[in-house]
Every structure is written in C-alpha cells, then in structure tokens.
C-alpha cells in the first residue's frame, strides 16, 4: 500500500511539473496512523490527495458490522491507500482510487477499486480507462471485470439524485478466498491506475476552456461532495472510528458550486454528459484495438 502511494506520488509530480506533494504524518490515539500527501494549486492538478493509513482498534464500527457481523467482538486491523485527483482543466476527469485490507480475528477481506468522473465526456477516454482495468482483472479471472464493473456502477450512484457519479470503473468489497491470489489481484489493479489515467491527462490538460466550462466543472464537483459525505463507505468508516478528519476530507475539491434546479441546454456538451456518459454501458468494448 505504501509503495503504491509512493509510485503514484512521484508520477503525478512529474506530470504536473510545478506542484509538489506535502507529506503530513499522523497518529491515531486508538492505534495506528498514516501519512497524507497533498498537492495544491499545481499546473495540472488543482488538488491531489493521496493517503496511506494503517489503523487498529478493539472493535469495528457499525458500518462494517452490518456487512460482516461475524467480525463482532474481535480487534481489527485495516490498511489501505486512497486517492482523489481534482484537475484544473474541466476536460480532464476527476479520478478516485482506493485499495484496502481488513482483518478482524478470523475474518479478513480485500476491497477497493478505481472510477472516473468526467465533466466533459470523451468516449476514447472512458473506453481506455475501462479497457486498462479490464486487462488487469482478466489477468487473474475473466469473471472479475464484469462483476466488479457492475458493482462499481451500483455503488457510485447518487440515490438522492438518481444518477451515477461518473463513467465508473471497478469496485469490490468483502472479497475473500485465496489470500495470495486476491492480494496479487489487488496489487495488479493498483498498478493499472497510472496507465489507465495518465494518457487521458496528457490528451486533455492543454485543451482551451472558458468560464462556461469552468462553472460546469464546479457544479458537477458538487455531486462528488454529495456522494462522499452521504454515501461513501470510507468516509463513514473514518468518522465512526475517530479517524483524522483532515485526511478523511482531503478528497474534497477546493472549489465547488451548486445551482438551483440546473438543467443543461439541449444539444450541448453539458447535456451530452447526462445523456451519454452518465448512462452505464460497456465502455471497455469501445476501446481502440
């Protein structure tokens, strides 16, 4: 988990060219700690947060026990790396990654995934992101990608808005079995992130944009905030275990706006986001061979 954080940190600094990550080491009173790294006001990334944590305690919170009641009464150990990148250019999508490992007495599992949230959609980008993650999944089990892609579509869904957060990716949780094989799978998925995302950044970060595109980006960032504060399991877990609030909320965008009863104009790129890209579909099959 720490090497994943290290690799992504160094590559993102190279891509940004100006911004540098500031590291903040922290300890949790109940046990464990972590290292948060944040880049702000970079050339490419307006904010980029990459966190590693390794915490332990006497009992798991209700949000976990609802899913794994057999873990009740056992001390727990959790480690993981999470990341959210908020680019400056509205044509570059926001991206999220999280991979984690839980252990509570005799119970253990892996979870995580990565998903893409564009503001202005490009089929080429969505297809590339999904195809890269699919290849990482297929190397371990051809049933993984369709299963975890569907899970991602269902998980990153704003029920109160009745719309997906973005074009998805993969998501899995409470996965058990052969420890070594599942660990290797999670490792492959983590290593697939940079080749899945950086080509998109390189294609889009120099595209010209104006106030209209910036305002729409800030408006759509509001959906990110809503999901993270209302539905996200990681946020809920952190709050229920007395996690470090600065690290928990590091994923928030630096600027955001809400509009009352916003409706995109028909025939615009903004409308296309809703009509095409916020509709779950088989993106991987649309990748160029």
UniProtKB/Swiss-Prot annotation:
Chain's gene name: hemF
Pathway where this protein functions: Porphyrin-containing compound metabolism; protoporphyrin-IX biosynthesis; protoporphyrinogen-IX from coproporphyrinogen-III (O2 route): step 1/1
Site (Important for dimerization): 160
Binding site for a divalent metal cation: 86, 96, 130, 160
Binding site for substrate: 82, 98-100
Name of the protein in question: Oxygen-dependent coproporphyrinogen-III oxidase
Catalyzed reaction equations: coproporphyrinogen III + O2 + 2 H(+) = protoporphyrinogen IX + 2 CO2 + 2 H2O
Function, in words: Involved in the heme and chlorophyll biosynthesis. Catalyzes the aerobic oxidative decarboxylation of propionate groups of rings A and B of coproporphyrinogen-III to yield the vinyl groups in protoporphyrinogen-IX.
Main subcellular location: cytoplasm
SUPFAM superfamilies per record: Coproporphyrinogen III oxidase
HAMAP family, per the entry: Coprogen_oxidas (MF_00333)
Superkingdom of origin organism: Bacteria
Keyword terms, alphabetized: Chlorophyll biosynthesis, Cytoplasm, Heme biosynthesis, Metal-binding, Oxidoreductase, Porphyrin biosynthesis
Family of the protein in this entry: Belongs to the aerobic coproporphyrinogen-III oxidase family.
GO biological process annotation, one example: protoporphyrinogen IX biosynthetic process
Cofactor: a divalent metal cation
Quaternary data: Homodimer.
Region (Important for dimerization): 224-259
InterPro entries registered for this protein in UniProt: Coprogen_oxidase_aer (IPR001260), Coprogen_oxidase_aer_sf (IPR036406), Coprogen_oxidase_CS (IPR018375)
């Amino acid at each position: 988990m720490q090497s994943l954080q290290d690799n992504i940190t160094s590559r993102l600094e190279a891509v940004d060219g100006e911004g540098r990550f500031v590291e903040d080491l922290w300890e949790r009173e109940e046990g464990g700690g972590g290292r948060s790294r944040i880049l702000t006001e970079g050339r490419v990334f307006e904010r980029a947060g990459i966190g590693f944590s390794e915490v332990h305690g006497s009992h798991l919170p209700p949000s976990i026990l609802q899913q794994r009641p057999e873990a009740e009464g056992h001390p727990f150990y959790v480690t993981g790396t999470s990341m959210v990148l908020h680019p400056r250019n509205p044509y570059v999508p926001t991206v999220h990654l999280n991979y984690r490992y839980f252990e509570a007495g005799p119970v253990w599992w892996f979870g995580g995934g990565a998903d893409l949230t564009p503001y202005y959609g490009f089929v080429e980008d969505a297809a590339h992101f999904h195809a890269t993650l699919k290849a990482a999944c297929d190397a371990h089990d051809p049933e993984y990608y369709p299963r975890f892609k569907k899970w991602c579509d269902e998980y990153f869904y704003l029920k109160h808005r009745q719309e997906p957060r973005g074009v998805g990716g993969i998501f899995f949780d409470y996965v058990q079995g052969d420890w070594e094989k599942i660990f290797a799978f999670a490792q492959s998925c983590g290593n697939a992130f940079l080749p899945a995302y950086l080509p998109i950044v390189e294609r889009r970060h120099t595209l010209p944009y104006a106030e209209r595109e910036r305002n729409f980006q800030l408006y759509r960032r509001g959906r990110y905030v809503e999901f993270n504060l209302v539905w996200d399991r990681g946020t809920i877990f952190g709050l229920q275990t007395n996690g470090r609030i600065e690290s928990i909320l590091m994923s928030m965008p630096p600027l955001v706006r809400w509009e009352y009863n916003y409706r995109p104009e028909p025939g615009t790129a903004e409308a296309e986001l809703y009509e095409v890209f916020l509709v779950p579909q088989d993106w991987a099959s649309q990748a160029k061979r």
